[in-house]
Amino acid sequence: MSFCSFFGGEVFQNHFEPGVYVCAKCGYELFSSRSKYAHSSPWPAFTETIHEDSVAKCPEKNRPEALKVSCGKCGNGLGHEFLNDGPKRGQSRFUIFSSSLKFIPKGKEAPASQGD
C-alpha cells in the first residue's frame, strides 16, 4: 500500500554521487550518500540519518510499521520511515521526497560537516 501520492520529479531516486543530503528548507544535514540504496519505490531510500536528531518522528495513524519524518531542525516534512523494511534485517527504510532534499557533493560541505 502506498502512503504517498507519486507525482514524478523524484530527481534523487537514482542519484548515487558521494555527498550529503540536507533539508531543502534549512540546510540541516539529514542523510549521507553512504546510507542511500536502490529501492523499487519511486522515492529515494536511505537506511539511516547522519545525526541522531536529523529527523523528528511521528507515528503514522493505524500503521505501526510507518513513521512520518520531518527535519529535526525546522520541521519540514520529509516522508516516512518504514521500520524493518531496509535492505538488511532489522534496518529501516527512509522513503524521502526529493523536493524536501538538497544535495551537497562530497568536498563541498561546510567545514563543520560530519556527513561524508
Curated annotation (Swiss-Prot):
Keyword Glycosyltransferase: no
Keywords: Cytoplasm, Cytoskeleton, Immunity, Innate immunity, Metal-binding, Nucleus, Oxidoreductase, Selenocysteine, Ubl conjugation, Zinc
Catalytic activity: L-methionyl-[protein] + [thioredoxin]-disulfide + H2O = L-methionyl-(R)-S-oxide-[protein] + [thioredoxin]-dithiol; [thioredoxin]-disulfide + L-methionine + H2O = L-methionine (R)-S-oxide + [thioredoxin]-dithiol
Domain of life: Eukaryota
PROSITE patterns (UniProt xref): MSRB (PS51790)
Main location: cytoplasm
Keyword Cytoplasm included in the entry's annotation: yes
Protein's name in the database: Methionine-R-sulfoxide reductase B1
Upper taxonomic lineage: Eukaryota, Metazoa, Chordata, Craniata, Vertebrata
